[in-house]
């Protein structure tokens, strides 16, 4: 073959290879286009892999999970019918408290992306329990955590994550803009209540299934505020308590009945010389009991109980085992406010069992440290300080904070009674520690009628952080 023939032969071979390669590329493009058309036609929208999406269709929750298999998204669906959380059962009989969750948020936040929070609380649907919390629009160990000791700011939001997990941007969902909040599930959807705005004109925004359904305007123009724990649902209606007025004197208190996110009824309590803040509410035999904070003049806790028509009764826990902080040493109680060390206070809870009461309280009488559960078999109505059970939760040498109640309905647990539970906030940072921030983690316990143990489950983070030095 002469040189010209060799050149022609090599050129022909290259041209054939090029044509074949071009045809393969065209075929590949057509294949990808057809595959994409089929996929989007079936799913209607592109979704990220390994993500769970919940949609609401005709009163049925549809759980959709996309699973990544060989770069192809396959959609699996499992429909879960909604229920009505009746709340008609009585509280389960219990002999003690079993540890349920601990998020270790501050320890994890020294190195990971964890929100600066306060006022965490837990609420359960018939499918899951979630931790709700008020963020400060900042992460731990970051410059924006500076000054987060402040209670009310436009940066605070209500968010939630699965119970027991540290609250981070990666596992949390936004619920509402709020510096005071509550949330609960009626068996069909989540109701959230978020209060934000100026002290002299704040507004509570009600959302149902994530959509704004109603609002409540401050009626006394003096820091409208709500529970900082779960609202309570009975037979499709949910109930919450709000306060508006002075934190150190007579204020105004209202109960709200809410159905599918809309206020259907409210009543203002006729409660002279009473002070209700940050109520912890739970259903029991079709009615609601709330145990609250007296920030004015009581070192024992006020309560209000009401039926679904908002017909109510009010009182104070009579026990000489006092539940607030600060408080005097245990002694003789009163069915009205106990005045010694009665000013200021802390959010807390109790569970009523007939004439008896489980009282949760800090171990210290004057600082937010330690926590214990006490069973006073006559404490709801009797004024002595005799009790029969004390269970340690946090040692007096470790910080605690707010505490509150939540319940697990029979639709979740499968038992024929309402399980009482509680959470404890473990506050760290300012004003007691040398940091630029204030935040907290949380633990929770549920009542059982079997073996339990007392111990100390503290926050456990070593401070200060890098940002504080």
Swiss-Prot record:
UniProt subcellular location: Virion membrane; Host apical cell membrane
Protein's recorded name: Neuraminidase
Glycan-linked positions: 50, 58, 63, 68, 88, 146, 235, 386
Span list, region Involved in apical transport and lipid raft association: 11-33
Chain residue ranges for the region called Head of neuraminidase: 91-469
HAMAP family referenced in this protein's UniProt entry, alphabetically: INFV_NRAM (MF_04071)
Region Hypervariable stalk region, residue ranges: 36-90
One GO term describing the cellular component: virion membrane
Annotated gene: NA
């Amino acid at each position: 073959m002469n040189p010209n023939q060799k050149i022609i032969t090599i050129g022909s071979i290259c041209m054939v290879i090029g044509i074949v390669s071009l045809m393969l590329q065209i075929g590949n493009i057509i294949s990808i286009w057809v595959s994409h058309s089929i996929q989007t036609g079936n799913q209607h929208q592109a979704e990220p892999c390994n993500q769970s999406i919940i949609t609401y269709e005709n009163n049925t929750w549809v759980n959709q999970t996309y699973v990544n298999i060989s770069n192809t998204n396959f959609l699996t669906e499992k429909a879960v019918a909604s229920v009505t959380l009746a709340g008609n059962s009585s509280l389960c009989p219990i002999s003690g408290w079993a540890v349920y969750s601990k998020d270790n948020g501050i320890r994890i936040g020294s190195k990971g992306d964890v929100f600066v929070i306060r006022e965490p609380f837990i609420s359960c649907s018939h499918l899951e329990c979630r931790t709700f919390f008020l963020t400060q629009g900042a992460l731990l160990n970051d410059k924006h955590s500076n000054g987060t000791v402040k209670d009310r700011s436009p940066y605070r939001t209500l968010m939630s994550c699965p119970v027991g997990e540290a609250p981070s941007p990666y596992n949390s969902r936004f619920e509402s803009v709020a510096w005071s909040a509550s949330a609960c599930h009626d068996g069909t959807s989540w109701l959230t209540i978020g209060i934000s705005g100026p002290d002299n004109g704040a507004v509570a925004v009600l959302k149902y299934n994530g959509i704004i359904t109603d609002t409540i305007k401050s009626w006394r123009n003096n820091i409208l505020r709500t529970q900082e724990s779960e609202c309570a649902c009975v037979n499709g209606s949910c109930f919450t308590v709000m306060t508006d007025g002075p934190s150190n004197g007579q204020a105004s208190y209202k109960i709200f009945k809410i159905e599918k996110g809309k206020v259907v009824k409210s009543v203002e309590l006729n409660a002279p010389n009473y002070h209700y803040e940050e109520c912890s509410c739970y259903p029991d035999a079709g009615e609601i009991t709330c145990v609250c904070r007296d920030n004015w003049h009581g070192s024992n806790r006020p309560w209000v109980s009401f039926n679904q028509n908002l017909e109510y009764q009010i009182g104070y826990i009579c026990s000489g085992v006092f539940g607030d902080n600060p408080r005097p040493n245990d002694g003789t109680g009163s069915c009205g406010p106990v005045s010694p060390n009665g000013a200021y206070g802390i959010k807390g809870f109790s569970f009523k069992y007939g004439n008896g009461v489980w009282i949760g309280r800090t171990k210290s009488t004057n600082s937010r440290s330690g926590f214990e559960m006490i069973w006073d078999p006559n404490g709801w109505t009797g004024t002595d300080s005799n009790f029969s059970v004390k269970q340690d939760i946090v040692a007096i040498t470790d910080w605690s904070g707010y505490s509150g109640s939540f319940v697990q309905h029979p639709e979740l647990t499968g038992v024929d009674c309402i399980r009482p539970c509680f959470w404890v906030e473990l506050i760290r940072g300012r004003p007691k520690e040398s940091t630029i921030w204030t935040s907290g983690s949380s633990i929770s316990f549920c009542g059982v009628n079997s073996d339990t143990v007392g111990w100390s489950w503290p926050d456990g983070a070593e401070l200060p952080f890098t940002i504080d030095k």
